[in-house]
Amino acid sequence: MRLLEERIKKDGQVLGEDVLKVDNFLNHQVDPELMAAMGEEFKRLFEGAPITKILTVESSGIAPAVFSGLAFHVPVVFARKHKSLTLQDNMYSATVYSYTKKVNNHISISKKFLNENDRVLVIDDFLANGQAVEGLLEIIDQAGAQLEGVGIVIEKTFQKGRELLDQRGIHVESLARIAAFEQGEVVFLDENNEN
C-alpha cells in the first residue's frame, strides 16, 4: 500500500537492526485517515470472505482492526493482555511473546464474543516472528471458530512470522512488506525487486 509505505518513510524511525518505531501514526498517536484507508484496503484484499468478526490484540492492533471492522460492517474483538476484574471466568486464553518488549503476555478473550459460528479475520500492526498471531490462532481454535485470513499492517519479511503462517496454509495479506533496514532506512520488499 503506497500511502502506508510513504508514511513509514516519512515518519517511521529505525531503531537498531530490527525495530521500526511508528508511534507518530500507528501505535501511540493514530492517523484516522490512514487507518480508514487501511481498513478499506483490507476489505478489498479479503473481498468475498464471509467474515463475521475481526480479531486483534490490544493495544496497537486496535486502531487498524476497528477501521477494518467498519469497512466490513462486523464487530471487532481484541484480546486483552492483562487480567481484568470484569473478565474472570469463561475465557479463551493463550500466551504470546512480545518481540519488542521481550516479555510473555497472557492474552484472553471472553467466550461470549467468539464462538464456533464465527468466521474470523485477524488484523495486527506488525508481523515479525508471528507470536501474537499464533496466540490469536490458538484462541480461534479454542472457540471452534474458522480463520478466514490474517491482515498485517507492517510485515518484517526478514523475520520468520510469514513463513510460519505460510506453512499452515493461511491467507496472509500485508499492507507494507519490509525487506530490510539498511543504514537507518527502511527498504521495502518491492524496492529489492523481490515478490
UniProtKB/Swiss-Prot annotation:
UniProt pathway: Purine metabolism; XMP biosynthesis via salvage pathway; XMP from xanthine: step 1/1
Protein's name according to its UniProt entry: Xanthine phosphoribosyltransferase
Recorded superkingdom: Bacteria
InterPro entries in UniProt: PRibTrfase_dom, PRTase-like, Pur/Pyrimidine_PRTase, Xanthine_PRibTrfase
Protein family per UniProt: Belongs to the purine/pyrimidine phosphoribosyltransferase family. Xpt subfamily.
EC number assigned by the record: 2.4.2.22
Residues binding xanthine, per UniProt: 20, 27, 156
Protein's UniProt keywords contain Glycosyltransferase: yes
Gene Ontology biological-process annotations: purine ribonucleoside salvage; xanthine metabolic process; XMP salvage
Residues where 5-phospho-alpha-D-ribose 1-diphosphate binds: 128-132
Residue ranges crossing the lipid bilayer per the database entry: none
Organism: Latilactobacillus sakei subsp. sakei (strain 23K) (Lactobacillus sakei subsp. sakei)
Quaternary context: Homodimer.
EC category name: transferase
Keyword Chaperone: no
Subcellular localization(s) per the UniProt record: Cytoplasm
Gene Ontology MF terms: xanthine phosphoribosyltransferase activity
